[in-house]
């Protein structure tokens, strides 16, 4: 039962698609370099202010097999996340959102992501956005998925989880979701063989909700 609590929240509170327009003046090219995460620019937008930029150590891997044999440990990298929390000081559960092949610009232009975030925050759930692309030299991977192999979204999520477990506002409950490529990332995070490479035992995410993941994963 505990495992599905965050999934129920995610389904129930992400239905409002009114009132927000994707017509936001935001230059993704100028805000995305290996040394500059797009999330730094997004955090300054009027519609997205009030969160906390979090930098954490991660790794770049080629596929799931390379992680299982610790091959990813040869390629360390610093990743940026943007954490938005409900008002107040209460400890809260946190949902990780992973962007699609469109890159972290999803967090600005995608109405669904915006309203999902607002509804979760209103109902006492924090949201962490992660930029899997800019630090690895990509803004989007529509034309070439090999620019940033799929597994890296899952690696980043697990490394972020290790950091947020000790965040003063965290109640120790975590969920993960994402659309398309981000949904595929959620499937990776359901594999205990994978998650146990980062956290001992079976303790990973408490709830997982893939959205339009790859058919081969589903």
Spans of features found by a protein language model:
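Boundary at the C-terminal end of the N-terminal hydrophobic targeting segment
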Residues: 17-21
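Sec-dependent N-terminal signal peptides
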Residues: 4-13
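Primarily recognizes the serine-hydrolase "nucleophile elbow" in alpha/beta-hydrolase
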Residues: 151-218
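Cap/lid segment of the alpha/beta-hydrolase catalytic domain
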Residues: 101-114, 119-122, 128-154, 163, ...
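N-terminal cap/lid segment of alpha/beta-hydrolase-fold proteins
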Residues: 24-90
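Short beta-strand element of the alpha/beta-hydrolase
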Residues: 91-101
């Amino acid at each position: 039962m505990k495992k599905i609590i965050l999934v129920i929240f995610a389904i129930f509170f992400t239905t409002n698609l009114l009132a927000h327009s994707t017509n936001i003046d935001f230059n993704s090219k100028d805000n995305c370099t290996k040394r500059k995460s797009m999330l730094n620019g997004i955090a300054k937008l009027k519609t997205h202010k009030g969160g906390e930029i979090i930098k954490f150590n991660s790794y770049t891997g080629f596929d799931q097999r390379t992680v299982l044999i610790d091959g990813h440990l040869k390629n360390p990298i610093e990743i940026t996340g943007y954490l938005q929390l409900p008002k107040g000081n209460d400890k809260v559960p946190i949902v990780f959102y992973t962007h699609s092949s469109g890159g972290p610009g999803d967090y600005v232009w995608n109405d669904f992501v915006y309203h999902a975030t607002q509804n979760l925050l209103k109902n006492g759930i924090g949201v962490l956005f992660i930029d899997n692309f800019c630090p690895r030299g990509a803004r989007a991977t529509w034309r070439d998925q090999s620019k940033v192999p799929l597994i890296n979204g899952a690696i980043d999520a697990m490394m972020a989880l290790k950091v947020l477990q000790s965040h003063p506002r965290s109640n120790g409950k975590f969920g993960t979701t994402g659309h398309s490529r981000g949904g595929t990332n959620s499937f990776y995070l359901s594999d205990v063989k994978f998650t146990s490479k980062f956290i001992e035992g079976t303790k990973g995410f408490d709830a997982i909700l893939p959205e339009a993941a790859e058919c081969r994963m589903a």
